[in-house]
C-alpha cells in the first residue's frame, strides 16, 4: 500500500507541475474512474477549461452521429465499378481560395514544421525535410514519419452535417489550416475517422488540448457532437458534473441535419 500511495502521489505532483509549465491557471486535479487503475486527469489551466465549457455550451449535442450516405473521398474512377467517384470534399489539398500555386499540405507543413527545407525550383513550396513535436504524443517526428491530420475528420464532418453543404464549403473545410495538424503518421492512421469518444491522444497531458482544437473547428462550422463525445471531452479536461455547461442531447442523428 505504501508503494502504491507513493506512485499516486508522484503522479499528482507531475500533473500539477505540468499545468504550471503550460499555463499556470488555477484548477483542481480530477480523478478518472474509467480504468481499473484510477489515475488523475492532468490539471488544465483555468482558461482552457473555461473555453472548452464555453464551446460545449453552444455546441449542438446529438444522441449519436449516424452514417450519412453518399460519402466518397476519392475523385477518380472506381476500378471495380468503373463509375466516377463522388469526390465529396474535392480534390485533395486543392484550396479553392488559394492561388499561390502551392498545395495545402505543403503550405501547412512549411508553417508547422521546424528546420524546413524545400525542393529547389518549387518556389519554396515542396517541403523536403523538417520536424515537429507531435501534438498527440509529445515526441519529435521527422518529415518521413509525418501525416497530415484533419482534426475533425472529413468523414466525421460529412456524417455530422457536411453532407448537406455545397461542394465549395466542403472544399474549404477540407483545406482549412485550422483543421489541419502535422502529426505522427501512425497516430493519424489509428485515429482515422474517429471522434473524441473513440480516440484521444496517447499522451494524457495532450488530450484536453486536442479536445479544444476539435471543438473550435466544430464551432466554426456549426457542426454537432455526440453525447459520447461531449462526455469524453468533459472527462479528459477534468470537467466535473457541476462545472459542465454542455447542451442537452437532441433526438436526431448527425445524418439528418
Give the ranges of each region predicted by the language model.
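Domain-level detector of nuclease and nuclease-like folds
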Residues: 131-257
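Charged, low-complexity surface segments at secondary-structure and domain boundaries
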Residues: 36-41, 88-96, 195-201, 217-221
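N-terminal export and membrane-targeting signals
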Residues: 1-18
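Cell wall/extracellular polymer interaction/catalysis modules
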Residues: 39-133, 147
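N-terminal intrinsically disordered, low-complexity, charge-rich
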Residues: 2-6, 36-38, 58
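C-terminal region of N-terminal signal peptides and the immediate post-cleavage residues
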Residues: 23-43
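Short amphipathic alpha-helical segments with coiled-coil-like heptad repeat character
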Residues: 1, 107-111, 192
Amino acid at each position: 500500500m505504501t508503494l502504491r500511495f507513493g506512485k499516486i502521489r508522484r503522479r499528482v505532483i507531475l500533473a500539477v507541475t505540468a499545468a504550471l509549465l503550460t499555463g499556470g491557471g488555477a484548477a483542481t486535479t480530477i480523478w478518472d474512474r474509467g480504468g481499473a487503475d484510477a489515475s488523475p486527469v492532468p490539471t488544465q489551466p483555468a482558461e482552457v477549461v473555461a473555453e472548452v465549457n464555453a464551446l460545449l455550451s453552444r455546441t449542438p449535442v446529438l444522441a449519436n452521429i449516424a452514417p450519412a450516405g453518399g460519402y466518397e473521398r476519392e475523385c477518380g474512377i472506381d476500378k471495380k465499378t468503373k463509375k466516377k467517384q463522388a469526390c465529396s470534399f474535392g480534390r485533395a489539398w486543392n484550396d479553392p481560395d488559394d492561388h499561390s500555386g502551392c498545395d495545402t499540405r505543403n503550405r501547412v507543413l512549411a508553417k508547422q514544421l521546424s528546420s524546413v527545407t524545400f525542393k529547389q525550383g518549387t518556389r519554396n513550396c515542396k517541403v523536403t525535410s523538417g520536424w515537429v513535436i507531435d501534438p498527440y504524443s509529445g515526441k519529435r517526428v521527422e518529415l518521413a514519419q509525418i501525416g497530415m491530420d484533419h482534426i475533425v475528420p472529413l468523414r466525421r464532418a460529412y456524417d455530422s452535417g457536411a453532407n448537406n453543404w455545397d461542394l465549395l464549403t466542403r472544399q474549404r473545410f477540407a483545406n482549412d489550416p485550422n483543421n489541419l495538424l502535422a502529426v505522427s503518421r501512425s497516430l493519424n492512421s489509428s485515429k482515422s475517422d474517429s471522434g473524441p469518444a473513440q480516440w484521444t491522444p496517447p499522451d494524457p497531458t495532450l488530450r484536453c488540448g486536442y479536445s479544444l482544437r476539435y471543438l473550435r473547428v466544430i464551432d466554426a462550422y456549426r457542426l454537432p457532437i455526440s453525447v459520447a463525445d461531449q462526455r469524453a471531452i468533459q472527462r479528459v479536461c477534468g470537467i466535473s458534473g457541476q462545472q459542465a455547461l454542455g447542451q442537452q442531447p437532441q433526438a436526431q442523428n448527425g445524418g439528418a441535419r
